[in-house]
């Protein structure tokens, strides 16, 4: 009889872990889909909306820990660097959103390149 609660506890941990990992993947999918929209659109309302979605996904993903860093302490250099990457990304998204709100599409397009550079740098480390 004692085995049932133990087994139930193990399964709930596994399910929670799988859900958490899916959430990080969902955030990454939101980021990449909306980056494509920002890259190709010239409509400031569409760009601003996509950037807001990107910002929310980045904030959510920043709280997660990718599989490559599982088991690392919260204050480890790797976790701090992972979260710093999202700080840089969010900062760049905010700058890009400001340019979109000002109607400066040329700066928006330049900024997309910087977002891609940040993504590539941190993907190579933690993906």
UniProtKB/Swiss-Prot annotation:
Heme b binds at residues 28, 123. One of its GO terms (cellular component) is periplasmic space. Its main location: periplasm. Binds 1 heme b (iron(II)-protoporphyrin IX) group per molecule. The keyword DNA-binding does not apply. The keyword Signal applies. Keywords: Electron transport, Heme, Iron, Metal-binding, Periplasm, Signal, Transport. Pfam families: Cytochrom_B562. GO terms for biological process: electron transport chain. Residues 1-21 form the signal peptide. Gene3D superfamilies: Cytochrome c/b562 (1.20.120.10). Its cofactor is heme b. It is found in: Periplasm. This is Probable soluble cytochrome b562 1. GO terms for molecular function: electron transfer activity; heme binding; iron ion binding. Electron-transport protein of unknown function. Belongs to the cytochrome b562 family.
């Amino acid at each position: 009889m004692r085995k049932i609660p133990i087994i139930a506890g193990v399964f709930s941990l596994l399910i929670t872990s799988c859900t958490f990992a899916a959430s990080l993947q969902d955030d990454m999918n939101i980021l990449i889909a909306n980056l494509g929209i920002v890259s190709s659109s010239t409509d400031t309302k569409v760009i601003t909306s996509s950037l807001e979605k990107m910002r929310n996904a980045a904030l959510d993903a920043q709280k997660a820990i990718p599989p490559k860093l599982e088991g690392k302490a919260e204050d480890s250099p790797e976790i701090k660097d992972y979260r710093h990457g999202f700080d840089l990304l969010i900062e760049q998204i905010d700058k890009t959103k400001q340019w979109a709100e000002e109607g400066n599409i040329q700066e928006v397009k330049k900024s997309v390149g910087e977002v891609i550079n940040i993504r590539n740098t941190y993907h190579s480390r933690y993906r």
